[in-house]
Every structure is written in C-alpha cells, then in structure tokens.
C-alpha cells in the first residue's frame, strides 16, 4: 500500500525522496482512506472533498505573497516580492527561524556551503512544527524540505519545488518567490510535499447530474 509505505515509521518528520507522481499518489490514497471507509463513522471527510498537492499560486498564497503573473515563471520575476523571506526581509536570518543549510548540516552538504553563522541545531530533517508558524499558522513554509507543487515550469516537463530545504543556503534561493525547476522523476532526501484539502468540483458535477436525472441540459 503506497500510502502506508510513504508514511514510514517516523510521523514527526517530513516524508522525502518521492517523485511528484508518488506525492500525487499519496494524496489519492489519503482521500480514499479518509472518505471511503466501509465504516462511515471512521470517515474524516465527505465525498465532496479530496486531497491534492497545492498549485504554484496556492503555495504562494500560503506563503503570504501577492502575485499577478499568469505562469510560475512570470510570478517568480515579479520584483515586488524580492527580498521577501519566510522569516521577514533581512538576510541572513536570525537563529531558530527554520531548518536551513547551517553549521549542524555542513558535513552532509556536497559543497559544504551554509548560511554563514547560522545554526538551527538540525543536521538534516527537523520535526514538523519545530519552528514558529507563519502569519496564517502554517509551519515550515520555508526550509526543512523543498515542496512539490502541481504546476510544471514553462513549456517543459520539469516540475516545481518551493520553499527551500535543510540544504538551502543562498539568499536568492531562500526568497519566497523562488521556484526550483526539476525533473518530476527526480528524488532527493531534501524533497518533500504538503497537501491541501479542496472541495471536489468534479464530484459536485456528478451529483448535480444525478439530481437532474442524468440530463446535461
């Protein structure tokens, strides 16, 4: 069972090392497990809802960015969001604002490059919720793991990751507007994901059609 395998044996840290398709597969498994249980009392969501990866624009909204571009590439280039970091507008960050490339992680980084003078105390992954949430109450929007979103980057087969991870050190890559284009089949111990719960529009259309006797007119 993909979902159970993905969850692993340590629920405190993010799941990593998945392709984008595997992340989407987990969302499908989670939806089914929480709304299609034979014992209706165990269902946590109704059939009107489902889980999926966030879109690129949804991720930006969760991070508090205001963007107007039509595509991820256009939104990334918007100067108004330059210098906006998960912790504020200054660089380098104060200590203990998130899990980034730091003194604790230096031996695990291929190039040994870190945020100079920064130490969050974690070599690699940190427990979810180990740092303060952002202004809307979400944890680890910046750092810990790069997060897959639904969109592709431009007219390419590359997917997009947002947020930076425990191995991110550069000022440019830590800006919240930054997008990381990667092959959707690529795996990394710093790549993870978060899920969003949405109203299932397709399911609503099906139900409406049934209510109308199956007529589309």
Model-derived segments and their meaning:
Residues 2-180, 184, 189, 206-207, ...:
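Functional-site microenvironments in short loops/helix caps that host divalent-cation chemistry
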Residues 189-204:
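Short, structured beta-strand segments at or near domain termini in extracellular proteins/domains
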């Amino acid at each position: 069972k993909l979902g159970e395998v993905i969850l692993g044996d340590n629920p405190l840290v993010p799941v990593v090392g998945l392709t984008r398709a595997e992340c989407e597969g987990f969302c499908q498994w989670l939806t089914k497990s929480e709304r299609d249980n034979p014992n209706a009392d165990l269902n946590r969501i109704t059939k009107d809802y489902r889980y999926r990866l966030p879109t690129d624009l949804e991720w930006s909204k969760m991070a508090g960015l205001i963007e107007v571009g039509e595509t991820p590439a256009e939104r990334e280039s918007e100067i108004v969001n330059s210098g906006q970091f998960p912790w504020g507008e200054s660089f380098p960050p104060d200590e203990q604002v998130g899990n980034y490339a730091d003194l604790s992680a230096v031996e695990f980084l291929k190039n040994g490059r870190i945020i100079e003078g920064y130490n969050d105390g974690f070599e690699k992954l940190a427990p979810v919720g180990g740092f303060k949430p952002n202004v809307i109450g979400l944890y680890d929007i910046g750092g810990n793991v790069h997060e897959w979103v639904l969109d592709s980057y431009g007219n390419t087969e590359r997917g997009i990751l947002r947020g930076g991870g425990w191995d991110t050190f550069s000022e440019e890559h830590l800006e919240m507007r930054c997008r990381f284009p990667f092959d959707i089949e690529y795996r990394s111990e710093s790549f993870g994901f978060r899920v969003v719960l949405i109203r299932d529009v397709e399911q609503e259309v099906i139900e409406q059609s049934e209510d109308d006797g199956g007529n589309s007119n």
